[in-house]
């Protein structure tokens, strides 16, 4: 027929008993849908009922009409305004030349009428089931995203868009890349359903606004996007970056970007005037670097950066609340681009230190690290602690950031700058200004922000040497991706409950600790990051806090971040989402696999920030520094085979190795050399750098053919092929794969939605999603899965391509 109605994927034919999420392989949902159906404060039940009616009527006609046609020819609704419309075949010959007799016609007519009544009854039940599913506790954010993506009906899409308001912010935030990618690349009905929620959240949170603006810019940058779709994403981005989405009270408080005299300003206005000064930090910094640059290429890049900055600011007219942060991010990105032009690691390190020392002159400011999970202001960047990371062609670098936590970023005043010399003369807490995290306390302490831009004494050499930068890993002990090492060092408190330990256990543990103190790495000019990364995080925090003028404050936090330029982190963000989903699945199914997803901030199509994994160094650095095998290094770090520390580290190694082997198999992760596999202080391995996943491989050679990387050194740490821990490893692999395939749809939809309109290399080829689904082996029995795991483990352990690739990396990049 003409415009055939395509039913949403979740809806089943009339013969099936339940509506479920698309691709759902589970059992009936009706037994639980009838229980605990909650009322939704945001959803209008009449609107929902009408939307479901529209969808299900069309589904009924589509399914029922085809079923009633014996000849399989297209059907047409003659009276297309309702359920009782006449259905006929488009290809029927004229009445005058029909060969059927009257009796046959009567029989067909009678059957059609009865079929229509049955279909009305069935679809009425379906309609009730679908609405009850939407309103039930089973309807989580994952199911909502699936229906939003698969449904072709504007009514259902609008309903789901309204339903987003009922989910927790953090649950929706996880799927923000999918929502914005659908907005940019799918039809207008989907965009219209999503936009109200995005606008509402942007009014509530400046950090959410920044995340949306960055992602919209990145996802709109693909060359194949049509002019109409590109302009749609750009229009929403401009709206987010404008004053239109500011809450009304903030519009009244925040001044314009034009300079204003200090006289007559209220304390809050003085604070925002300071923020305006901060917003020009990178412009001032760029001009200073031009005057001192000795490299003509660097000078040219600075001019391009300045021109680009002016163009962006003029184009989007950034409000005060986002302008300082955008300039702060641009400054960090510009540093990375300039470092990439220098030939040696030593020159890059020196340049990085000098660049950050200049940046420090604009702090504290109304800026934050977007990778953090709490409100805060950046106060210092310890430039001498920054290091350049290993990279052949680019210059990613790691910085540490000192921040002060606050209750609300928008309403809390920017902290006053505390000069270093004042701290040294009056070190006691009693003589320092109190600076709590409450709004009232902070308003009293920081109501007036002095301008130290021209104060030479305030910015002495000693001051610059102690600075630090913020990060998201140390704040909370919740189940986010923030590093627990940071949490332990900053927020933990000694338990007041008495703990009784046998004296013999105390003596034994003390002797083990004294005999097996973790080793320190030697400084290597070719790899300066090794020493910084090997230092225990708690020691680093203590050392930096003691030397900081802000360290006495109870809301002081230390964070860290990796800044990358020239790399597209959209694939990294996709991998992070899949890892988080698998981590949640294994926790839900109580499978003791261990993986550590780390946060990714996509800034543009070729730049971003990464949350570092603290207390961890690469296996390459371990082997280069220690000149030991992996097993011998474990014995050196954790003690002999029978010690509690070694057994705990060995178990951690097995659980993390099994987890990442499954990740590498499902996502087809490549480029698995020892520089991309970390080993932390507790024995876990952590895979990093997911630049080659799914359909992409280094240089598109497809050289690594094994399911995952499992070397003989890994097996030795597990106790050998006949060891109990090796059998435990294979058992975890099987349990993890069984658990993952139970929730395959949750994993696949993350990847499938991001493929829409994407030019990422991981989506090259038409079979990416089909191959991903096949790796879950839905048709296999558990016995067949066990055999498959045995074959994958054996093949990976004996893979000649893994050994050849490690040798290739050693010869070309020196990676051991």
Curated annotation (Swiss-Prot):
Keyword field: Acetylation, ATP-binding, Endoplasmic reticulum, Golgi apparatus, Kinase, Lipid metabolism, Membrane, Mitochondrion, Mitochondrion outer membrane, Nucleotide-binding, Phosphoprotein, Transferase
InterPro entries: Kinase-like_dom_sf (IPR011009), PI3/4_kinase_cat_dom (IPR000403), PI3/4_kinase_cat_sf (IPR036940), PI3/4_kinase_CS (IPR018936), PI3K_accessory_dom (IPR001263), PI4KB-PIK1_PIK (IPR049160), PI_Kinase (IPR015433)
GO biological process: inner ear development; phosphatidylinositol phosphate biosynthetic process; phosphatidylinositol-mediated signaling
Catalysed reactions listed for this entry: a 1,2-diacyl-sn-glycero-3-phospho-(1D-myo-inositol) + ATP = a 1,2-diacyl-sn-glycero-3-phospho-(1D-myo-inositol 4-phosphate) + ADP + H(+)
SUPFAM superfamilies: Protein kinase-like (PK-like) (SSF56112)
Cofactor(s), names only, from the UniProt record: Mg(2+); Mn(2+)
Pfam families: PI3_PI4_kinase (PF00454), PI4KB-PIK1_PIK (PF21245)
Cross-referenced Gene3D superfamilies: Phosphatidylinositol 3-/4-kinase, catalytic domain, Phosphatidylinositol 3-kinase Catalytic Subunit, Chain A, domain 4
Region described as Activation loop: 687-711
All residue ranges annotated as the PI3K/PI4K catalytic domain in the record: 535-801
Membrane topology: Peripheral membrane protein
Top-level class of the enzyme under EC nomenclature: transferase
UniProt EC number: 2.7.1.67
Family (UniProt): Belongs to the PI3/PI4-kinase family. Type III PI4K subfamily.
Summary of the function given for this chain in its UniProt record: Phosphorylates phosphatidylinositol (PI) in the first committed step in the production of the second messenger inositol-1,4,5,-trisphosphate (PIP). May regulate Golgi disintegration/reorganization during mitosis, possibly via its phosphorylation. Involved in Golgi-to-plasma membrane trafficking. May play an important role in the inner ear development.
Subunit description: Interacts with ARF1 and ARF3 in the Golgi complex, but not with ARF4, ARF5 or ARF6. Interacts with NCS1/FREQ in a calcium-independent manner. Interacts with CALN1/CABP8 and CALN2/CABP7; in a calcium-dependent manner; this interaction competes with NCS1/FREQ binding. Interacts with ACBD3. Interacts with ARMH3, YWHAB, YWHAE, YWHAG, YWHAH, YWHAQ, YWHAZ and SFN. Interacts with GGA2 (via VHS domain); the interaction is important for PI4KB location at the Golgi apparatus membrane. Interacts with ATG9A.
Protein name (Swiss-Prot/TrEMBL): Phosphatidylinositol 4-kinase beta
Organism field: Rhinolophus ferrumequinum (Greater horseshoe bat)
């Amino acid at each position: 027929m003409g415009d055939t109605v395509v039913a949403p994927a979740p809806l089943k034919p009339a013969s099936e008993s339940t509506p479920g999420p698309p691709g759902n392989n589970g059992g009936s949902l009706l037994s639980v849908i009838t229980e605990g159906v909650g009322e939704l404060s945001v959803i209008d039940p009449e609107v929902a009922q009408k939307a479901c009616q529209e969808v299900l009527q069309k589904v009924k006609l589509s399914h029922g009409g085809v079923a009633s046609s014996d000849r399989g020819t297209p059907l047409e609704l003659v009276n297309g305004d309702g359920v009782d419309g006449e259905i006929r075949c488009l290809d029927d010959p004229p009445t005058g030349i029909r060969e059927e007799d009257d009796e046959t016609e009567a029989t067909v007519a009678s059957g059609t009428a009865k079929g229509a009544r049955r279909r009305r009854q069935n679809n009425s039940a379906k309609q009730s089931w679908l609405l009850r599913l939407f309103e039930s506790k089973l309807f989580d954010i994952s199911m909502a995203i699936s229906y939003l993506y698969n449904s072709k009906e504007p009514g259902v899409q609008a309903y789901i868009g309204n339903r987003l308001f009922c989910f927790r912010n953090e649950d929706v935030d996880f799927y923000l890349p999918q929502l914005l990618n659908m907005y940019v690349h799918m039809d207008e009905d989907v965009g219209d359903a999503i936009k109200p929620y995005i606008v509402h959240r942007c009014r509530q949170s400046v950090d959410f606004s920044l995340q949306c603006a960055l992602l919209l810019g990145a996802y709109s940058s693909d060359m194949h996007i049509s002019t109409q779709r590109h302009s749609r994403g750009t229009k929403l981005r401009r709206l987010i970056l404008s004053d239109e989405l500011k809450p009304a009270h903030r519009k009244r408080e925040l001044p314009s970007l034009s300079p204003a005299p200090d006289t007559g300003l209220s304390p809050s206005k003085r604070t925002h005037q300071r923020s305006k000064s901060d917003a020009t930090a990178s412009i001032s910094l760029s001009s200073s670097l031009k005057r001192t640059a000795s490299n003509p290429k660097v000078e040219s890049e600075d001019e391009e950066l300045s021109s680009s900055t002016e163009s962006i600011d003029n184009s989007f007219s950034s409000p005060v609340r986002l302008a300082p942060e955008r300039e702060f991010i641009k400054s960090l990105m510009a540093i990375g681009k300039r470092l990439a032009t220098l030939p040696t690691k030593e020159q890059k390190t020196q340049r990085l230190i000098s660049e950050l020392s200049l940046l420090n002159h604009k702090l504290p400011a109304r800026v934050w690290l977007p990778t953090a999970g709490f409100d805060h202001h950046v106060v210092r960047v310890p430039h001498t602690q920054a290091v350049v990371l290993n990279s052949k062609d680019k210059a990613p670098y790691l910085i540490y950031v000192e921040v002060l936590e606050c209750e609300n970023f928008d309403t809390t005043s920017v902290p006053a700058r505390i000069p270093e010399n004042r701290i040294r003369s009056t070190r006691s807490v009693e003589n320092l200004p109190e600076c709590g995290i409450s709004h009232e306390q902070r308003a009293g302490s920081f109501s007036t922000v002095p301008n130290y831009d021209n104060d030479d004494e305030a910015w002495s050499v000693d001051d610059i040497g102690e600075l630090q930068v913020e990060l998201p890993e140390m704040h909370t002990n919740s189940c986010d991706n923030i590093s627990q090492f940071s949490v332990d060092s900053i927020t933990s408190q000694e338990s007041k409950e008495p703990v009784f330990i046998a004296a013999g256990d105390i003596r034994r543990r003390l002797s083990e600790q004294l005999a097996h103190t973790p080793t320190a790495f030697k400084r290597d000019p070719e790899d300066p990051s090794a020493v910084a990364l090997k230092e225990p995080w708690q020691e680093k925090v203590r050392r930096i806090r003691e030397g900081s003028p802000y360290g006495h404050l109870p809301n002081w936090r230390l964070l860290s971040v990796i800044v990358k330029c020239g790399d597209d982190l959209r694939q990294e963000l996709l991998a992070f989402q899949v890892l988080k989903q698998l981590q949640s699945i294994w926790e839900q199914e109580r499978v003791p696999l261990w993986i550590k997803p780390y946060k990714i901030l996509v800034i543009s199509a070729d730049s971003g920030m990464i949350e570092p994994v603290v207390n961890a160094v690469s296996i390459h650095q371990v082997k280069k520094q220690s000149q030991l095998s992996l097993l011998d290094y474990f014995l050196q770090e954790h003690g002999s085979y029978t010690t509690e520390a070694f057994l705990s580290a060995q178990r951690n190694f097995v659980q993390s190795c099994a987890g990442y082997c499954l990740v590498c198999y499902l996502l087809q992760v490549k480029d698995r050399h020892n520089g991309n596999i970390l080993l932390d202080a507790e024995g876990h391995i952590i895979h990093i750098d997911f630049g080659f996943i799914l359909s992409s491989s280094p240089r598109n050679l497809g050289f690594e053919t094994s399911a995952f990387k499992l070397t003989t050194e890994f097996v030795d740490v597990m106790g050998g092929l006949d060891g109990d821990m090796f059998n435990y490893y294979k058992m975890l692999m099987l349990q993890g794969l069984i658990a993952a395939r139970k929730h395959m749809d949750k994993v696949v939809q993350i990847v499938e939605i991001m493929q829409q309109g994407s030019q990422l290399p991981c989506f090259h080829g038409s079979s990416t999603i089909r191959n991903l689904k096949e790796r879950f082996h839905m048709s296999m029995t558990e016995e067949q899965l066990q055999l498959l795991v045995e074959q994958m483990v054996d093949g990976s352990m004996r893979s000649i391509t893994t050994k050849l690739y490690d040798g290739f990396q050693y010869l070309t990049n020196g990676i051991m």
